[in-house]
Amino acid sequence: MGLIYLLHVRAMLNANKISSHGFRKDDRFEVTACATVVGTINDNDSTFELDKQCFSITRSGVFAPRFDLKSGGVLIATARQKPFRNYYTLAFDGKDWTFKAVVLLATQFGLFENDTQRGSVSAGPPLHSLKDITADLPDELPREIQMFLISLFVRQLTAPAN
């Protein structure tokens, strides 16, 4: 009698910068899962689209900014950044997560639940860091929260200091 093994494979998300058009700086990213487009991130407008639904990210605060994810004016999740660090705490669905840089140049972030790493988001190669961004995040996080984390990561990569 053969054994049946169930293998759970997480759907990795990939984000790639879309070519700019016009005179305006246009940082837009196409996000795919299994080579199928699932959404678009617009870093300039702090928005993303997922399954034809629009989400916005609003920032408040200067030294310890807070980022609110909203859809249709309804608050979905909040991420708070530690002052002057690539370190966020994410409150969602009664759980607290930590999303922080795990390498010196902040080209890779880890997602932690308590002290256990549960996922990661990584930039592409050094000269093309905005291409081939890869997110390996837990399936228990809804896709809009995964897109929120990728958006925060893209914000770090495109910040003037980087």
Q: What name fits each language-model region?
A:
Residues 2-162:
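Intrinsically disordered, low-complexity proline/glycine-rich segments
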